[in-house]
C-alpha cells in the first residue's frame, strides 16, 4: 500500500465555500506541506492542475529541491502541450529529482477552462488525442535510452524524428497515472497507463470500474495497478470526526452550493457527473444525507470540483475502510484534508501505525522514554561531544 498526500496550490482553508480561515498560496506554505509529507513518510504528493492552481511543473520543481524522498505526481495535458516537449520536461525532472517523478495524464473535463486554454475538442476527440499523446510520449522516452528517434502519424498528433537526448532515470519512463470514468477513459487506461485512479465512490461502484479497466487491459495482454483519490477527516473518536466534517461545511449556504453545482453541471466530465449524483445537489447537509456509504461522506463535493468525498471516522475505522478498498485491488491512496498541513500530521500520526507494514516502515523514528521520563518523538540520541 502506498499513501500520497496533496499540495494545495489552489489555496487552503479550515472551511469550504468561504474565505474565512483561508490561507494564501505562497511557496513558504507549500514548502511546509511538502516537507511535512516528506518527513512523515508519505510516498508522494499530488500536484493539482488547472486554471485555479499554480503551474504544477514549476511548483513541483521548486518543492523537489527542498525534499529528500518524496515523489511528485505531476500533470501532463494533451492538447495543451506537445508530447515530445512533455517527454523532455519529464526526463529532466526525473533526473534532477533522482527518479522521483510520476506522471498524471489529465484529459480535462471543464469545457470553459479548456476553451480558455485554446482546446476546442469534444469529449471523444479529447480521448483520441490523449491516447495519441501518450503513445508518442511513451515511445519517445523509451527510445531515448538507446538514442533512437520516433515517427508517429495519428489523427490528431504526428511527429517525425522525435527524440529526447537526455533520458529519464526511470526506465523506460516515469510511471503514468490516469483517471476517468467514461468508456473511452477506461479503454485508454487499459491500453497504456500504469495506475488507474478513481475518485472516492462507494466500494461497489469502485469495484465495477476496476473490473472494467481490468477487462480493457486484458485485451492488450496487460495488467494495471489501481489508486483512489479521497479526502480524510480523522479524529480520535467517531463523534469528533463527524463534528469536524460538519464544521468543514458549517459556513456554506444554499446560494453558494447552488452556484458551485451549476458550474459543475456544465462540465463535460462523467466523473464529475458521478460525484454530483452522490449528494443529489446538496439540498440537505446532514450526515444522514451525505454519508453515502459507511464512513464515506459526500460533503466536500458540495462546492469542490473533482474529488468530492471523504473518509470520516476514528483511526481504526478509517484504516478498516482503506483495507476494504485495498481488497478490491486499490494499491495507492491519494489523500488530502483541510487544512492540509495540520491534517497531514494528524492522519500520519493516527492512521499510519494501523496500516500495512509497507506504510509503517516509512514512519520517522520510534517513540522512546527520555532520561527524565518524558516521551520523545525520535529514536535518535545525540552523542556527547568528544574532547
UniProtKB/Swiss-Prot annotation:
- Report the function annotation for this chain: Catalyzes the desulfonation of aliphatic sulfonates.
Q: Which reaction does it catalyse?
A: an alkanesulfonate + FMNH2 + O2 = an aldehyde + FMN + sulfite + H2O + 2 H(+)
Gene Ontology molecular function, alphabetical: alkanesulfonate monooxygenase activity
Flavoprotein as a keyword of this entry, yes or no, is yes
NCBIfam families under this entry? Answer: alk_sulf_monoox, PRK00719.1
Give the family this protein belongs to, as stated in its UniProt record. Belongs to the SsuD family.
> Which gene carries the instructions for this protein?
ssuD
UniProt cross-references to Pfam families, sorted A to Z: Bac_luciferase
Give the UniProt keywords, A-Z: Flavoprotein, FMN, Monooxygenase, Oxidoreductase
Q: Which GO terms describe its biological process?
A: alkanesulfonate catabolic process
Q: According to the lineage, what is the superkingdom?
A: Bacteria
Q: Which InterPro entries match?
A: Alkanesulphonate_mOase_FMN-dep (IPR019911), Luciferase-like_dom (IPR011251), Luciferase-like_sf (IPR036661), SsuD_RutA_monooxygenase (IPR050172)
What is the protein named?
Answer: Alkanesulfonate monooxygenase
Question: Could you tell me the EC number(s) of this protein?
Answer: 1.14.14.5
What is the uppermost EC class here?
A: oxidoreductase
Amino acid at each position: 500500500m502506498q499513501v500520497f498526500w496533496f499540495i494545495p496550490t489552489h489555496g487552503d482553508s479550515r472551511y469550504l465555500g468561504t474565505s474565512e480561515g483561508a490561507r494564501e498560496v505562497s511557496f513558504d506554505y507549500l514548502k511546509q506541506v511538502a516537507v511535512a509529507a516528506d518527513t512523515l513518510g508519505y510516498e508522494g504528493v499530488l500536484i493539482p492542475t488547472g486554471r485555479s492552481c499554480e503551474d504544477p511543473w514549476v511548483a513541483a520543481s521548486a518543492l523537489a529541491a527542498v525534499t529528500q524522498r518524496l515523489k511528485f505526481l505531476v500533470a501532463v495535458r494533451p492538447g495543451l502541450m506537445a508530447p515530445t516537449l512533455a517527454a523532455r520536461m519529464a526526463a529532466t525532472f526525473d533526473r534532477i529529482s533522482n527518479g522521483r517523478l510520476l506522471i498524471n495524464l489529465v484529459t480535462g473535463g471543464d469545457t470553459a477552462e479548456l476553451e480558455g486554454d485554446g482546446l476546442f475538442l469534444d469529449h471523444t476527440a479529447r480521448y483520441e488525442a490523449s491516447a495519441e499523446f501518450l503513445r508518442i510520449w511513451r515511445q519517445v522516452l523509451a527510445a531515448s535510452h538507446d538514442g533512437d528517434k520516433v515517427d508517429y502519424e495519428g489523427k490528431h498528433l504526428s511527429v517525425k524524428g522525435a527524440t529526447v537526448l537526455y533520458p529519464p532515470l526511470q526506465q523506460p519512463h516515469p510511471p503514468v497515472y490516469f483517471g476517468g470514468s467514461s468508456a473511452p477513459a477506461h479503454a485508454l487506461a487499459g491500453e497504456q497507463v500504469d495506475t488507474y485512479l478513481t475518485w472516492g465512490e462507494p466500494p461497489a461502484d469502485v469495484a465495477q470500474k476496476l473490473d472494467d479497466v481490468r477487462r480493457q487491459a486484458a485485451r492488450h495482454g496487460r495488467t494495471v495497478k489501481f489508486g483512489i483519490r479521497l479526502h480524510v477527516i480523522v479524529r480520535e473518536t467517531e463523534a469528533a470526526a463527524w463534528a469536524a466534517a460538519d464544521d468543514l461545511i458549517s459556513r456554506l449556504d444554499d446560494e453558494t452550493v447552488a452556484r458551485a453545482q451549476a458550474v459543475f453541471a456544465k462540465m463535460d466530465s462523467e466523473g464529475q457527473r458521478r460525484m454530483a449524483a452522490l449528494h443529489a445537489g446538496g439540498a440537505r447537509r446532514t450526515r444522514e444525507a451525505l454519508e453515502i456509504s459507511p464512513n464515506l461522506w459526500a460533503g466536500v463535493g458540495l462546492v469542490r470540483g473533482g474529488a468530492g468525498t471523504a473518509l470520516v471516522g476514528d483511526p481504526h475505522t478509517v484504516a478498516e475502510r482503506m483495507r476494504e478498498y485495498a481488497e478490491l485491488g486499490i494499491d495507492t491512496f491519494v489523500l488530502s484534508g483541510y487544512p492540509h498541513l495540520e491534517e497531514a500530521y494528524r492522519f500520519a500520526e493516527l492512521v499510519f501505525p494501523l496500516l500495512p507494514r509497507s506504510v509503517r516502515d516509512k514512519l520517522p523514528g520510534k517513540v522512546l522514554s527520555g532520561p527524565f521520563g518524558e516521551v520523545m518523538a525520535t529514536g535518535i540520541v545525540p552523542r556527547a561531544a568528544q574532547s
